[in-house]
Curated annotation (Swiss-Prot):
Disulfide bonds: none annotated. Residues 1-154, 180-207 are annotated as: Disordered. Residues 98-121, 133-149 have a biased composition (Polar residues). Residues 14-24, 75-97 have a biased composition (Basic and acidic residues). This is UPF0328 protein ECU02_1590/ECU04_0060/ECU08_2120. Belongs to the UPF0328 family. Transmembrane segments: none annotated.
Length: 207
């Protein structure tokens, strides 16, 4: 049985699509397309979304004014004022406070009498501490630099001559003990040495 062609018949005039003018306008106008057949955007949207030719970062801004540059802070602003006659500021002072003039008394030359120098040379030979004299102008509790040729803090060292003398005496005493024991007349010191060292070294026995 053939299908009726009712779906191809025109719509009656009382259909709701025919009643409204907006629906009739949409039905009559085809969609706007470009040459490729795709949907065309309205001109307002297309103008804003289309990229500009070239690098947009290198182009100067065409619309509006450039943002105002930040002003550098003037040096006169703030708490430090540089005027011709500035008021005395007790909190922030850039000038250093004057230091007490104490450096002059450290550089005053110290006069040392010749008698003291001769005594110091003799004391230095003996290994004794040297003598220093304080001038009466400088108080006793202040620091007083000493001249470079006087060394008052040298450590007490035994002179080389006395050290050699003690070494020679020690060697002589040992030789006397061994020679006395070899001749058969040991002294009291040799007896104690014999008890401490029953077997003396061979090189000392040959003496």
């Amino acid at each position: 049985m053939p299908r009726p062609a009712s779906h191809l018949a025109p719509m009656p005039s009382d259909h709701p699509d025919f009643r409204s003018e907006s629906s009739a306008r949409l039905r009559c106008q085809p969609p706007r397309t470009n040459n490729c057949g795709t949907f065309k955007q309205p001109p307002s949207v297309a103008a804003t979304s289309r990229p500009k030719p070239g690098n947009p970062f290198l182009q100067p801004p065409t619309k509006g004014t450039p943002p105002p540059k930040k002003k550098k802070k003037n040096h006169t602003e703030g708490c430090h004022t540089h005027e011709a006659n500035p008021e005395p500021n007790t909190k922030h002072t850039e000038t250093e406070s004057p230091k007490p003039q104490t450096s002059t008394q450290h550089h005053t030359p110290i006069t040392i009498p010749s008698s003291l120098l001769s005594q110091n040379t003799q004391r230095e030979k003996r290994g004794l501490p040297l003598l220093t004299s304080r001038p009466s102008t400088i108080p006793a509790n202040t620091y007083q630099p000493q001249s470079p040729h006087i060394h008052s803090h040298t450590p007490l060292q035994r002179p080389i001559s006395t050290a050699l003398l003690h070494q020679n005496l020690h060697i002589r005493a040992r030789n006397i003990r061994h020679t006395g024991r070899l001749h058969g007349s040991p002294t009291k010191g040799a007896q104690t040495a014999q008890q401490a060292q029953p077997h003396p070294p061979k090189q000392l026995a040959t003496l």
